[in-house]
Amino acid sequence: MERPLTVLQVSLYHPTQGPVAFAHVPQQLQHDASRLLVGRGQNTHLQLQLPQLSRYHLSLEPYLEKGSSLLAFCLKVLTRKSCVWVNGLPLRYLEQVPLGTINRISFSGIQMLVRKEGGASLETFVCYFHLSPSPLIYRPKAQETDE
């Protein structure tokens, strides 16, 4: 019997580049339980067409948490050039953070929303990519008061 796969639903948005930045993004990507590389390099699994990105900008790394039978993921920053924001937390070169069920990630103008749906397979996971026509991350603007 085949075990259901863990699914990452990944939505992508860029305010100025739009679909051009995501021209090489597949609709679906099935991947083994090794790290998934994101960047502008030809050897990345998720290749994004932005000159300010590093060839290897970040990775999504699956792992098995102690006491769990489901894949968990962490995001690791692979670039020295810039900061990657994950759920409001700034990360720099080689820093990593575990991902929850819903994750808001931004880097180099790209907004990425990653939703994890658990599955029983520990050998493989699948990503479904969606291009968003509108922003995925909203930051409230500071309001001035008379106080």
Curated annotation (Swiss-Prot):
Tissue and organ distribution: Expressed at high levels in spleen and at moderate levels in lung, thymus, and small intestine.
SUPFAM superfamilies: SMAD/FHA domain
GO CC annotation: cytosolic large ribosomal subunit
FHA domain span: 36-108
A GO BP annotation: cellular response to Thyroid stimulating hormone
Alphabetized GO MF terms: deubiquitinase activator activity; ribonucleoprotein complex binding
Subunit structure: Interacts with TIFA.
Protein task: Inhibits TIFA-mediated TRAF6 activation possibly by inducing a conformational change in TIFA.
The protein's name in its UniProt record: TRAF-interacting protein with FHA domain-containing protein B
Organism: Mus musculus
